[in-house]
Curated annotation (Swiss-Prot):
EC number(s) from the headed UniProt entry: 3.1.3.-, 5.2.1.8
Cofactor(s) the protein needs: Mg(2+)
Alphabetized InterPro entries for the sequence: Cof (IPR000150), Cyclophilin-like_dom_sf (IPR029000), Cyclophilin-type_PPIase_dom (IPR002130), Cyclophilin_A-like (IPR044666), HAD-like_sf (IPR036412), HAD-SF_hydro_IIB (IPR006379), HAD_sf (IPR023214)
Family recorded in the similarity comment: In the N-terminal section; belongs to the HAD-like hydrolase superfamily. Cof family. In the C-terminal section; belongs to the cyclophilin-type PPIase family. PPIL1 subfamily.
Catalytic reactions on record: [protein]-peptidylproline (omega=180) = [protein]-peptidylproline (omega=0)
Gene3D superfamilies registered for this protein in UniProt: 3.30.1240.10, Cyclophilin-like, HAD superfamily/HAD-like
Ranges where the PPIase cyclophilin-type domain occurs: 286-468
Source species of the chain: Streptococcus pyogenes serotype M6 (strain ATCC BAA-946 / MGAS10394)
UniProt name for this protein: Putative bifunctional phosphatase/peptidyl-prolyl cis-trans isomerase
Keywords tagged on the record: Hydrolase, Isomerase, Magnesium, Metal-binding, Rotamase
Pfam families, A to Z: Hydrolase_3, Pro_isomerase
Active site: D22
Positions that bind Mg(2+): D22, D24, D221
Amino acid sequence: MEESMDAKLKYKAKKIKMVFFDIDDTLRVKDTGYMPESIQRVFKALKAKGILVGIASGRARYGVPQEVQDLHADYCVKLNGAYVKDDAKTIIFQAPIPADVVVAYKKWADDMGIFYGMAGRHEAVLSARNDMISNAIDNVYAQLEVCPDYNEYHDVYQMWTFEDKGDGLQLPAELAEHLRLVRWHDNSSDVVLKGTSKALGVSKVVDHLGLKPENILVFGDELNDLELFDYAGISIAMGVSHPLLQEKADFITKKVEEDGILYALEELGLIDKELQFPQLDLENHTGPKVTIKTNHGDMTLVLFPDHAPKTVANFLGLAKEGYYDGIIFHRIIPEFMIQGGDPTGTGMGGQSIYGESFEDEFSDELYNLRGALSMANAGPNTNGSQFFIVQNSKIPYAKKELERGGWPTPIAAAYAENGGTPHLDRRHTVFGQLVDETSFQVLDLIAGVETGAQDKPKEDVIIETIEVFD
């Protein structure tokens, strides 16, 4: 599960000038090839803000899926940092494995009965072909040829093991001086030049551009991202990622299939959220509905469990058990709101289904517009059973003033046209909205009753029951 993002990390994000993405199980799901549609939006949005985008992968260029190539990253760090190009295919850095080291590795592999592969600039090859090798490599590089003497004619930038020895496999001392193993599959490890890593490749881009590590944000999921997570200013692990990588991550986001990259970048403020405002589109909202039946008429509301799940569950739970039956609206202020939900009728009582007060659930997509159903509270995170419905029909602010204050344009327009209580936004949890004209008429009727001390109606306005339509 993804964690919450703290303010300190959001502040660090203000320094980000470039974002690097791993490919497998980061941009796309390796086993299925699925890449979320949101990835295209991510690349376009970052570029539109002047933030550079890069790929940092263990794959070579010829192993990069077409849909990833079509994203046109500004820079590509390939083969775990051994080969770096920009989008114009200018070579920024390259570090082939010395020929004698390749020969020594092949001899050791043959002596150990280990199959291997070699990756050059333009193609990769295998020492042999069997089911174990195919199971490991075909999702990354399909239909590789068998060519064990490839290194005699081409530079080699990376190699692989294919074996069933797992993490216990170790290089002999003479090879470990030059090479290291990075496990990426149950039956395979990358064999890379010692000192070479994605972090090295990214650092070459950073130096080339005159940037600093603090300007770099990286996404990854596997062990070959460890050095990069140490290097970058901000590191984000995918929801499904290696536990050791998660320990180093500044933030663990959602899964690939849950638009984890988009989610993290929106939370960091590097991409503007594409907000939806269900209160302005009730016809297309499918949440549960309730009817508050009172001695002055009925009010029907739709609820928003996706935005305020705990609050909606509390309200529905109390309604279904009859908790609100017979309770009055104990506080009514015309051109403001009507408040109820306290069994003592004093504004001092009430209890949630959780047995204690619970936390606020603020959303960038819900506001205290006229007709909004919100939680009453005694301060932050003190929600119980009390609620109010916003009745105000006019506010002293124009649309442009609200926009300057940070309210989204559609919400600012709704406030200016229909009224509401914008000063309560992010102070009270909005979790529902009146749905029809009849309900608004009843709301206004209740708001117009005569009140006395502490805004309490002189004649009780009673909630007879709340009917729930899940």
